[in-house]
Structure formats: structure tokens, C-alpha cells
Amino acid sequence: MPTHTCPTCLKEFAQKGHLTAHLNRKKKCEPSALVIRLTSLEAEVKELRNVVVLPTEVTPMTAISLFSGAGGDTLGLERAGIKVVAFNEFNEAATKTHTTVFPSSVNIVHPETKDSNIRNVPDSAFESYKNKVQLIMAGFPCQGMSHAGKKRVDDKRNELVHEFVRVTKIVQPEWIIGENVKGLLSRKGRLNPEAPLRPVIEIIRDLFDSIGYRITYQVIDVSTIGVPQNRKRLIIIGHRGTTYPHVPWNSLTDASTPPTTSIRSFLEPHLDDAMELPALYKPQDQPSHYWIPTTETAVKGTPHKNLDRLTRGLRNRSSAEKVADPTGPDQLIEPEGLISFGVRKGGYYGMVVNPDVPCNTIISTYNLCPRLFVGLYNPTIRKYWIRCMTSKELGQIQGFPATYQWQGTEKEKIIQIGNAVPPPLAERIGRTILAGRVELKEEAQGLEATEAVTGATGATVDDDDDE
């Protein structure tokens, strides 16, 4: 049987009419102890709400990307939780890709001419971001840095690193991240013709020091952080102020799952622009892991001219050979061919990649002179082919998703991929900074720049600027 309860004294009645009579009587009932306690608690909660500031939505860290390319650093930073509100990129195809994938990120250009060459973008275009952006990341080119005075080292605008410094000085972010080839550590330069040659990294350190930023740097092999490619890159991390950032470089490789070391899942079993491998290479004697199984039986399209040349064993004569025989032919035939497996035997050679280990470094000139090839085998008809990698495959080897919306021609896409910052690299660095794991100390971290992590084994690692 349902009961009816007085909200004051909590006395129960079998009939609703009895409760009504109880509530309407002249002598009101006394509140029960439980009601008194609940009333007191409600008052306390109300009072606390007046003095306690409840947390509001956290404003995400924001960033600007310079020399952005197709957006590898932007993708990585945004995956880490850092919003890239603006970027600067000069290349038209790369700009289209970045704008397509990140439509809310603004390309900072000259306000009147719309020139996106950072050298021509005035200070005023960056001033609106002053003290509003917490991070700048720049995969800055440094190919123009003088060596032995062969270039106009007195022209500071000749070095794009100066643009990185200029924008940093204007915007005043808390953090800066720079990315470059590891070979930068071995280069020397100078800021003016009278100055002695010294390591470029020291010049960069002093440039940032002069505007109030302290830096540390390290070489990272991206194969240790989820990118299936032996690609070693110099990473510079700086902080505004007088204290030095101490980065837990080894922890960049910390992950709940092991990094991807195989490229097999990225390689597609088609014969587009492929070339049948001649018998002289004895493909049937090569280990089976070099071959991607295919059911296709006929080549579609035209093989790249460099693939055709290498497969036929045709190479240019060296300078020494020309001196020895000035009347000889411009090109020579290597009777054993110029295709090797797993390891490039020399500068002339092309290589069939091992799909089960990290790939050699992908460079922006791959489409011009490819030397890394995919091997394919049809077991039914027992034929072997090799072909160049596609932009879709190369993009995934660089750490981009297969669905990334690359814009431009196939050549333009490959240039963008070769120049890109691998997204997982930018993501790991961004997460490390956001998590507060970069300590600030009075002394420098130690700028020996030995490699923080070593690459996975199995494939040769060529120079930064080559496959």
C-alpha cells in the first residue's frame, strides 16, 4: 500500500487526505533531524558556489608553423592538442595541400601583394599574433649557409633561419621548435665576411640567445617513434627566458605500442609503370620477403626512365673514366646490372626495398631520380617486376595517413612528401611540451648533440640528402 510522507517531520500516512489534514493544522510539525541536516548541507553548498571558481574550458596551446610545406608539423602538433592557427608557405602546391587539410589555419602573407615568400612578408603581418601564440615550429631550410666564404655570408636575408628568428622576436612565443637535417651539425658558416668560420649550430644558438631564447638540440631517428623510415633529423627546442630547456629526449620514444618498422602494409600489389626484372638479376634466388605478391599479369603505363636505365645496367661515365679515355662513350653498361636488394651497393645503384624493415630516407627528388623500388611477384606465371613507389605509399612511409589530401601533380606531391616533417615526430615533441616534461634549469642541457635514439636495424642509412 502506498504511503504519503510529510516533507518536514517525515511522518508517514496511509491516506493522502490524512497527510493534507496534517499539513493544514494550525500547530506545525517539527522538522526531523534528517531534514535539518539536509537543509544545512544545501546552504553550505550554496555558499561554496559563491566563493569557489569552478574550472572553465581549458584554452588550447596555439602555434604558428613556418616553412610549413604540406602540413606534416601541423598535423603532428594538432594531434598533440596544439592548435596551429596560422602558417607560412611559399610553394603553391604545398599551400593548397595545407589549406585543404587545415582550412581554418591562415597563410600569413604580405597584406597587399599577397606574396607568401617569408622574406617579403612584413613584420606587421606577424604582429597580430604577438603574445597570443605559445609556440612556433619551423622546418627551416638551411642550404644557403656559407661554406668557406663561397656565398655572400654578409647577406643575413640569404639565410632563412634569420626569418625564423625574426618572426620569433615579433611574436614572442614561449616555445620554439626547429627541424633540420642532421648534417647541419657538421656545417660551418659566418654572419659577415670578417668573422671566422664556426659551426652553424653555434650561430643559430647565438641568434636565438640574442633575442632572449635558450635552446637545446638533439638528433632523432624517426624510425624509433613510429615512422618506418631511417630518417635522422636535428631537432632544436627553445624556451623564452634565461633558463635552459632540458628535454627528456629518450622519452620521445616511449609508447604503449612498439613503433612501426615495416612498410609492407603500405605497398600495393599493382604493376602501374612497372618493369619486368631481367633474368640476369636471378630474382628467383632472392629471399621471398623482397616480393609483394600480385595477381596482375601485365604492366600498365611506362616505367620511369631511371628505373629503365638502372635495370638495363646503364650508367654515366665517371670523371676519372673520362680522363682515362676522352674518346669513350658517355655511358657504360654494367654487365651485372645496377639493381641490388636491401642495400645499395654504391652511388650508381638502385635498390629493391625490404618491406619488413624501415625504408631508406625519402627525399624530395625521388620523382626525378628514384633509386628505391618495390619488388612484385606473380607466383602463378612466375614473373618478377619492380616499380617506383607512388605518392600514396611514400606519404605513409613519411608518417602521413593514407587518406591525406595531397594536392598537385604526382611530382609535386612527392616533393611535398620528401620535404615534410614526419607528423609523428611533431606530435611526440608537442605532447612532451604540453605534458610539462621539459624542465627549465639555470645551466644548459649539454649541447653535444649525440643521437638520443638509434634507428631500427635491417636497412642501410644513407646520408641526409640522399635515399
Language model: regions and residue ranges:
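Short, electropositive alpha-helical surface patch
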Residues: K188-I211, N230-I235, H239
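Conserved S-adenosyl-L-methionine
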Residues: Y213-T224
